[in-house]
Amino acid sequence: MISTNDFRTGLTIELEGEVYQVIEFQHVKPGKGAAFVRSKLRNMRTGAVIEKTFNAGEKIPRARIERREMQYLYSDGKEYNFMDMETYDQVTMSAAQLGDAVKYLKENMNIQVLLFQGKSIGVELPNFVELEVIDTTPGIKGDTASGGSKPATLETGAVVQVPFFVNVGDKLQIDTRTGNYIKRV
């Protein structure tokens, strides 16, 4: 059991038989009445986001999530396939279950698959991934004086803002938590 006063972004809780991840939370103490915690929760199985208000100090069961290293194999358009590196069992997940992680998945990439009661409910990506730029506008000499940025499409289909000196074919390090460009590699 965990108290609502101990909520943190990324925490997983069990509510009404489902697993939810805390996306946002806010402790509210009105001038009149008891304090409460307003939160946004993402259902780990379906990807649906709900808003829920709890009394401050309310005890909620914490979801016991198992992490297993798996390799991303391929996508058939709707479902994403992963293989357990120890047992060679294959697991499929929908895009809704993966959320924003689909923008950073590369074939043969090792990731942590999250399991609840033996069923896959999501993935945990490495903090940084290296991806190749497949499309961006060419940089023009003298562009860098303003220190601006331009959009670039990566090999996974994700679009990120990059500095003007980045060209097609460059490999970039991307932060998977924020989706921001870090550096050229």
UniProtKB/Swiss-Prot annotation:
Q: What is its main location?
A: cytoplasm
* PROSITE patterns from the UniProt entry: EFP
Q: Which residues form a coiled coil?
A: none
Biological process terms in GO annotation: peptide biosynthetic process
Which GO molecular function annotations are given, in alphabetical order?
translation elongation factor activity
Q: Name one GO cellular component term.
A: cytoplasm
Q: In which pathway does it act?
A: Protein biosynthesis; polypeptide chain elongation
| A Pfam match | EFP
Where in the cell?
Answer: Cytoplasm
Question: What CDD domains does the database record attribute to this sequence?
Answer: S1_EF-P_repeat_1, S1_EF-P_repeat_2
Keywords in alphabetical order: Cytoplasm, Elongation factor, Protein biosynthesis
**Record's family?**
Belongs to the elongation factor P family.
> Per its UniProt record, what NCBIfam families does this chain match?
efp (TIGR00038), PRK00529.1 (NF001810)
Q: What does this protein do?
A: Involved in peptide bond synthesis. Stimulates efficient translation and peptide-bond synthesis on native or reconstituted 70S ribosomes in vitro. Probably functions indirectly by altering the affinity of the ribosome for aminoacyl-tRNA, thus increasing their reactivity as acceptors for peptidyl transferase.
Q: What is this protein called?
A: Elongation factor P
Taxonomic lineage of the native organism: Bacteria, Bacillati, Bacillota, Clostridia, Eubacteriales
